[in-house]
């Protein structure tokens, strides 16, 4: 999927994360808000200044979302894409695979 396609996905909330603790909090909030109530996804912005930190944030977000959905007995069929958002940020967009299909991506 191209960056333009990724950025055309409707976003419910954008999280600008600075560190690992922010990643855990954002993942828990995404699960609380829910992936299936609206035809929208979530966007995570991570700093490019430290590639190692960005990788850890991305890993924490994706694994915490999956494990939290399992704990809440919700469907875990989530798609995500990582991309270069801008000069200062990497981005991840997370969205339900059903929403991706309904939106025609």
Label every PLM stretch briefly.
Residues 36-99, 103:
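Acidic, low-complexity, intrinsically disordered interaction modules
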């Amino acid at each position: 999927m191209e960056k333009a396609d990724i950025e055309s996905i409707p976003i419910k909330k954008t999280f600008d994360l600075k560190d690992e603790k922010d990643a855990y909090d954002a993942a828990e909030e995404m699960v609380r808000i829910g992936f299936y109530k609206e035809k929208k996804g979530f966007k995570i912005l991570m700093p490019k200044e430290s590639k190692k930190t960005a990788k850890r944030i991305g890993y924490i977000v994706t694994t915490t979302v999956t494990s939290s959905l399992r704990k809440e007995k919700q469907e875990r069929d989530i798609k995500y894409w990582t991309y270069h958002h801008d000069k200062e940020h990497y981005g991840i967009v997370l969205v339900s695979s059903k929403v991706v299909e309904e939106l025609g991506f």
